[in-house]
Amino acid sequence: MAKGKDVRLVITLECTNCSQNPNKRFSGISRYTTSKNRRNTTNRLELKKFCPQCSVHTIHKEIKK
């Protein structure tokens, strides 16, 4: 039987460079969606992903929806 709460959450990761840098090549912010396990990862997720606006690998942090 399934439990009441879903353990996996769909989260959004946002580039930290794009959100802080006003002088960038393109307008916009790089965002990725992924899922995380609520029980195993209680704190905010940080992953190093490729940002097409910055053209480099940067740290993407979990944001609130």
Curated annotation (Swiss-Prot):
Family matches, as PANTHER family: 50S RIBOSOMAL PROTEIN L33, CHLOROPLASTIC, LARGE RIBOSOMAL SUBUNIT PROTEIN BL33C
Please indicate if the UniProt record lists Ribosomal protein as a keyword.
yes
Instruction: Give the family per the record.
Output: Belongs to the bacterial ribosomal protein bL33 family.
Q: Which domain of life is it from?
A: Eukaryota
Show the GO cellular component annotation of the record: chloroplast; ribonucleoprotein complex; ribosome
List the protein's name.
Answer: Large ribosomal subunit protein bL33c
Q: Which NCBIfam families match?
A: PRK00504.1, PRK00595.1, rpmG_bact
GO MF term (any one)? structural constituent of ribosome
Its annotated compartments are: Plastid, Chloroplast
Q: Which HAMAP family match?
A: Ribosomal_bL33 (MF_00294)
Organism of derivation:
Chaetosphaeridium globosum
Q: Which UniProt keywords apply?
A: Chloroplast, Plastid, Ribonucleoprotein, Ribosomal protein
